[in-house]
């Protein structure tokens, strides 16, 4: 390929990745904003309600995120079918329908576990009064799981068709619905009963139902999606495609669970160190979570772009799609890392009154954690981008093993050792997380570089 032609191809791919990735980043941030609005309303109920909601939310997240990973198989399977250009409409329809089946199938045991959330929290030695409040909250919040997983399936479908903006607009509307629902149900406005913490759970469930119904409306009414007839005979089982879906999705779910639960475990370690460490950790991890949404959205775009090229059997385009996404994601995280190093006080001030002398210790600790988080950002971005690129090649089982090794085999043990044995305390926990993420990032990128030699490109 002539140099000018190659340069033009790279520019086109960079523009296409950015056009696809930006709405996904914004949608992810909008979904985070729903959680933030819940915290704001619950915080007005008092510290005990806030603590109970945090307990419940941690359990909900641990269960929900496995399902999130499971239905994430939708995007690479649909993208591959579109790239292959065979019997595309039927193939895409089969995949999306089985994604919806998967959302329902997983939600049944997931909701059963959440229904017994109080018993689970008591079993892990949480305070009985907090466990009781968290259990009541979870019995309301659990109804958000089925529509949320269904929303993710339909969002993956429109994303694979490279039309992600509708999902972002619906997510914005859901934020408004969530705020209104909290105002009505938490405090008993407009004649509704004041349900407190339970009201916050119901508001989230109703807003999430709105997310799903909004996406149903889009795929049924928009002519670009309507021709796929996704809901015709949706109750008809397709066992072969369901098995293929779970074969690809189960490792994604497991890898996602490994990552989410290591952060839950890190919070427990911080709790053992003391209240100031835990408070500083909560602030630093919230900042890191917001910036993580950027490479996470770009990684979702990478899955689609790589998947299209993989289905079309275009190895050069596979490489362009992967490296363009990687460059965008790492570039964004480098900016985030610089901000954490140069202006930590500005970031912390969004969560803490840094002028209050009573907060001096938490400010000092949070600033130290953000210094480690600057490195953390780069490797966290690299690992999620690597996973997204490999997912586009339908490579999920080996990355799952990498996640298990990096997070639980190396990251958590090294964090505990540095925190308690080396005396690094909270900085040790964060350093352990960074070490684990760095290992996963190196392994993911090594596999991407060896994608042809290990036979990933020959499976299309």
Curated annotation (Swiss-Prot):
Keyword Thylakoid: no
Domain of life: Bacteria
Keyword field: Antiport, Cell inner membrane, Cell membrane, Ion transport, Membrane, Transmembrane, Transmembrane helix, Transport
One protein family per Pfam: MatE
GO process annotations (BP): monoatomic ion transport
Membrane topology, from the record: Multi-pass membrane protein
Family recorded in the similarity comment: Belongs to the multi antimicrobial extrusion (MATE) (TC 2.A.66.1) family.
Role played: Multidrug efflux pump.
Protein name in UniProt: Probable multidrug resistance protein NorM
Native species: Bordetella parapertussis (strain 12822 / ATCC BAA-587 / NCTC 13253)
